[in-house]
């Protein structure tokens, strides 16, 4: 509040821009006053309950809660408990303001460490068990955050995830290992409760203690699919690409669901600008922009595919189709951002984002130090496999004509199972260390990235491209007909950046490079099987630059060929 008031006092309004800044700072002050009032009301309620409470232990707790709520957020927290209360208030304020998903807790073990160290280690005001109980109470509160979603949203983001990510481990801004006693305690709290929120994320690099990785792996072995492991080196590279310093890159955290972003509250996040369905793009190319489900012209007219002379002409048409639809997505997104900028600025989120108070602009106005928006894709592997199938079966070996292929797809391979098996089995498949089809995938991804990263949104921020589907691959697959990779009409597309389950042919080490990991473990063993720990902590994991968060499923009671195979990709569960 003091900073905003100083800015108001030091600014002379000489025009519209100055007045907008003054209005923004005044709004921040009003917001702060409202947040303090909210906390004081909580204190009054706790005192009211304490007055009628006959349980002395509970009464003491209620009075402590009241005291905490009269300290934070008006003043800085002094204890580990007050720090928890401060973080929770901030989380609730975000939810009140924007009712948002993907509002994570950041590098919890870093900003909470001074309070833990003071209370538990230095002054011994509380025991480690009491600190653990506070963490567990905090985690239970996180489970109370919930969104009621419509049918499409519930299908596309199945399981009603809120993506309240809590990050531990990694590096300090000066490049030292950041793991501390609280890092382990955060995992232990999650291990004991086994709740869906918060989602635990372990940052790993060559300096990460094996004990921390082992603890996370042990949790996975017990069947939690939690925590996820994130590779520092790949994430730092992505973060540096957004223009931040090396210190900010080392301090990276998860912005949104899985996207790495600069730490320290310097980014406005990576909101979901929209998804493009690669299966549908192929359908549009094969039907010259017409949606075969509706008969309407929905895409770009790229010509009759029967006239294409080679695979390069097909890929050129597909690239034009993809860019056309990403431009439609970003046009709609910019319109929405412009409306939000004028009608619905998020004041609290702006207050706690570096650059906004200093510049006098909300995050929608481009006030954040770093600004990005996420563009997403579904069916990436299906696209690569479809291109490879057309190249091999239509243009090279001439097993079928383009007209025959289109007719078979339009009829969902009815009476054409032989053709479908040909498309499924003859061409190379992405993600199996086959250079040609992997090259197709890489070519298409690089093309999209090189294009969209040149674009700016309404806030002046840049777009980041993510192969990241959640379960949108299910809803997108449901509205797409059969595809040239042999997929049937209505079937889900591949999950995120990984390949289709039945096309995983060439082993764990190949799968590491996709990026995602496939590991073999036996969840019935009392001791952790080494392959699980070795893959997560191995040099190979770091050397291939696996950015995709590594989540591991250890199913119980179901054995496949004497082993339990499970794919490791956070949103593929």
PLM region spans:
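Conserved catalytic cores of very large enzyme subunits
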Residues: 1-27, 61-573
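A conserved hydrophobic secondary-structure block that centers on an alpha-helix together
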Residues: 50-60
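A basic, often C-terminal nucleic-acid-binding module that engages the phosphate backbone, implemented
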Residues: 47
């Amino acid at each position: 509040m003091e900073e905003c008031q100083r800015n108001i006092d030091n600014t002379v309004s000489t025009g519209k821009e100055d007045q907008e800044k003054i209005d923004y700072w005044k709004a921040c002050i009003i917001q702060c006053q409202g947040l303090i009032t909210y906390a004081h009301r909580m204190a009054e309620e706790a005192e009211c309950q304490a007055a009628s409470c006959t349980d002395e232990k509970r009464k003491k707790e209620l009075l402590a809660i009241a005291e905490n709520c009269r300290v934070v957020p008006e003043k800085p927290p002094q204890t580990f408990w007050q720090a928890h209360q401060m973080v929770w208030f901030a989380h609730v304020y975000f939810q009140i303001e924007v009712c948002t998903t993907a509002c994570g807790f950041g590098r919890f073990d870093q900003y909470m460490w001074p309070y833990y160290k003071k209370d538990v280690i230095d002054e011994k005001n509380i025991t480690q068990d009491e600190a653990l109980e506070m963490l567990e109470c905090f985690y239970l509160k996180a489970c109370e955050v919930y969104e009621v979603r419509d049918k499409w949203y519930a299908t596309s983001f199945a399981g009603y995830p809120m993506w309240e990510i809590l990050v531990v481990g990694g590096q300090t801004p000066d490049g030292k290992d950041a793991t501390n006693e609280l890092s382990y305690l955060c995992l232990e709290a999650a291990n004991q409760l086994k709740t869906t929120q918060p989602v635990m994320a372990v940052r790993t690099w060559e300096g990460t203690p094996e004990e921390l990785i082992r603890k996370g792996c042990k949790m996975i072995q017990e069947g939690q699919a939690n925590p996820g492991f994130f590779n520092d080196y790949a994430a730092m590279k992505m973060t540096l690409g957004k223009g931040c310093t090396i210190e900010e890159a080392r301090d990276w955290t998860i912005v949104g669901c899985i996207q790495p972003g600069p730490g320290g509250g310097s980014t406005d996040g990576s909101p979901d600008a929209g998804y493009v369905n690669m299966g549908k793009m192929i359908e549009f190319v094969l039907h010259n922009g017409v949606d075969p489900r509706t008969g309407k012209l929905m895409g770009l007219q790229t010509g009759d595919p029967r006239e294409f002379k080679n695979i390069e002409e097909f890929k050129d048409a597909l690239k034009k189709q993809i860019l056309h639809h990403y431009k439609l997505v970003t046009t709609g997104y910019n319109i929405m951002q412009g409306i939000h900028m004028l009608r619905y600025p998020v004041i609290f989120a702006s207050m706690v984002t570096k650059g906004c108070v200093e510049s006098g602009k909300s995050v929608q106005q481009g006030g954040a130090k770093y600004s990005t928006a996420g563009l997403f894709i579904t069916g990436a592997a299906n696209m690569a496999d479809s291109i490879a199938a057309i190249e091999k079966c239509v243009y090279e070996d001439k097993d079928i004509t383009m007209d025959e292929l289109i007719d078979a797809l339009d009829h969902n391979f009815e009476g054409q199972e032989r053709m479908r098996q040909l498309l499924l089995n003859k061409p190379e498949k992405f993600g199996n260390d086959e250079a040609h089809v992997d090259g197709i995938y890489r070519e298409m991804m690089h093309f999209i990235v090189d294009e969209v990263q040149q674009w700016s949104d309404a806030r002046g921020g840049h777009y980041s491209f993510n192969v990241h589907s959640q379960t949108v691959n299910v809803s997108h697959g449901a509205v797409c007909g059969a595809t040239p990779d042999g997929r049937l009409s209505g079937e889900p597309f591949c999950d995120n950046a990984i390949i289709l389950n039945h096309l995983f042919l060439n082993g764990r080490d190949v799968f590491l490079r996709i990026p995602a990991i496939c590991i073999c473990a036996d969840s019935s063993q009392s001791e952790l099987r080494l392959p699980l720990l070795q893959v997560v902590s191995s040099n190979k994991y770091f050397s291939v630059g696996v950015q995709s968060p590594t989540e591991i499923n250890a199913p119980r009671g179901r054995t496949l060929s004497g082993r339990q195979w499970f794919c490791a990709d956070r949103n593929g569960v």
